């Protein structure tokens, strides 16, 4: 037997109209408990659920009480009794428990206990019974065993005494004989008459909790009277249990209906919002479809432009090739011109050499003319003609020398110009070669551009196809969203009707709760 500690012997009280409800499986594991039971026990719902019910057992309750309870329940009958339960902190509270088996398809699947607050007198009787059982005394005192029998035979004894008094009054043997003969049948008839109605009641009492042990907790009566009184109390507890469960169910139903009503209103509001947002999505999808179509058109235009760019790139490659060829020809021409200028410079050098020879001859002629003039002067008149010729020759030699000097300057200038031309031609040749290299690089770049444009053209074609497909999908989505919007509107109407039904259900549950509350008092 489980011994839960500690205990404080401090009683917790609760309102008389409060009902404490629990259900267990066949092993006594708690499967349900209402809020009132949780509050008075001090345990949390998590601590109680799936825990053994003897978690709240108080050590002051004798094991015989629980043994009697389980024997009664396993026999398929309800059990009723005053029980002292322990709180989590060691306090206690008294209950008048009515425990019934729970059936499912004819088989017992668990037990249900509905507890109400007992009276102070019932608690005192239960404590007295606990003390007797705890002391090892019999549950039913000996006097309670023979006193009911005496009370049953009391009418027969009284009638016998009346017959005896009649005999004394007649003052004869015939009077005593007559009194004896009348007393026996009258007493037996009275006893049978008394037992006849009582037996019918006792047969009804057998269907309820009428055990003498339990009766001691609820009444001071003895024998059949105690059993009948206990049967009435049991029926009252059974009715209260039924009403309490109806009330508990009505409370749960009311709460569920209230939650369903709230959810229905929220669902209706959500569906209305969904419908509005679906319309916005439909509008957005329409705009997206139009935009997609426009994108498809723009992509097609881009594809056309890309194709033209590809053609222009091809043409640019052709022009680059022609430019490269022209520059190469120009480079060759510059090279040839440079060679000609170089030859001209060489010829100028040769002319310079000839001019130097002529200059030397002129100088020599001038010297000879000077010598001739000297000789003519010596000859006098005979050499005057020769002197004139010598002067002319000297003059011619001087002019030749001057011309030769001019030619020499011109040839030097021509050589400088030719050298500059050669340098310029060499620079032009280098630049032409660099230009050819740049044209080759441009041609390579144009090849890359042409390949990129080809890839862009291919991707643009794919994008155009995807845009067309996306446009078709957008139209399909638009149709689906329109269908969803229609269904959402229909569902919203149904949600409103559901909300209205939930309100009516809440009203009905509240009416049921009020009806049960009127009778469960």
From Swiss-Prot:
The chain crosses the membrane at residues 147-169, 174-193. Disruption phenotype: Mutant shows decreased aerotaxis. Aerotaxis is abolished in the aer-mcpB double mutant. GO terms for cellular component: plasma membrane. Chemotactic transducer for aerotaxis. NCBIfam families: sensory_box. Belongs to the methyl-accepting chemotaxis (MCP) protein family. This is Methyl-accepting chemotaxis protein Aer. The gene is aer.
């Amino acid at each position: 037997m489980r011994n839960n500690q500690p205990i404080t012997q401090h009683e917790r009280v609760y309102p008389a109209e409060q009902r404490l409800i629990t259900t267990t499986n066949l092993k006594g594991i708690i499967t349900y408990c209402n809020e009132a039971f949780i509050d008075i026990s001090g345990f949390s719902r998590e601590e109680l659920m799936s825990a053994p019910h003897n978690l709240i057992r108080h050590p002051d309750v004798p094991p015989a009480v629980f043994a009697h309870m389980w024997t009664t329940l396993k026999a398929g009958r309800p059990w009723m009794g005053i029980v002292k339960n322990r709180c989590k902190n060691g306090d206690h509270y008294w209950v008048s428990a009515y425990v019934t088996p729970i059936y499912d398809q004819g088989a017992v699947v668990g037990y249900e206990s509905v507890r109400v607050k007992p009276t102070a007198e019932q608690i005192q009787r239960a404590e007295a019974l606990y003390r007797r059982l705890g002391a090892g005394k019999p549950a039913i005192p000996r006097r309670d065993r023979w006193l009911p029998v005496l009370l049953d035979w009391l009418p027969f004894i009284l009638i016998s005494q009346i017959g005896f008094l009649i005999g004394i009054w007649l003052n004869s043997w015939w009077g005593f004989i007559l009194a004896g003969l009348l007393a026996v049948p009258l007493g037996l008839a009275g006893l049978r008459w008394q037992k006849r109605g009582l037996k019918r009641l006792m047969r009804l009492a057998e269907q309820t909790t009428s055990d003498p042990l339990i009766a001691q907790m609820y009444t001071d009566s003895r024998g059949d009277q105690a059993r009948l009184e206990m049967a009435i109390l049991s029926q009252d507890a059974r009715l209260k249990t039924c009403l309490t469960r109806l009330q508990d169910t009505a409370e749960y139903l009311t709460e569920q209906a209230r939650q369903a009503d709230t959810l229905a209103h929220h669902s209706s509001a959500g569906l209305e919002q969904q419908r509005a947002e679906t319309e916005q999505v439909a509008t957005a999808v329409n705009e997206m479809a139009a935009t997609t179509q426009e994108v498809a058109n723009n992509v097609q235009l881009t594809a056309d432009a890309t194709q033209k760019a590809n053609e222009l790139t091809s043409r640019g490659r052709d022009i680059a090739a022609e430019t490269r060829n022209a520059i190469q020809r120009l480079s060759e021409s510059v090279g040839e011109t440079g060679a000609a200028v170089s030859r001209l410079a060489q010829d100028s050098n040769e002319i310079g050499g000839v001019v130097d020879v002529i200059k030397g001859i002129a100088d020599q002629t001038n010297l000879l003319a000077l010598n001739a003039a000297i000789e003519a002067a010596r000859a006098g008149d005979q050499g005057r003609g020769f002197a004139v010729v010598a002067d002319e020759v000297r003059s011619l030699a001087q002019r030749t020398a001057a011309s030769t000097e001019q030619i020499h300057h011109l040839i030097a200038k021509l050589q400088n110009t030719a050298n500059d031309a050669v340098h310029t031609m060499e620079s032009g040749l280098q630049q032409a070669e660099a230009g050819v290299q740049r044209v080759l690089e441009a041609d390579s770049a144009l090849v890359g551009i042409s390949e990129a444009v080809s890839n862009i053209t291919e991707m643009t074609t794919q994008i155009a196809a995807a845009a067309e497909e996306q446009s078709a999908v957008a139209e399909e989505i638009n149709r689906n969203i329109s269908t969803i919007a229609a269904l959402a509107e229909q569902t919203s109407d149904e949600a409103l009707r559901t909300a209205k039904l939930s309100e009516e259900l809440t009203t009905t549950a509240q009416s049921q709760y009020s009806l049960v509350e009127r009778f469960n008092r």
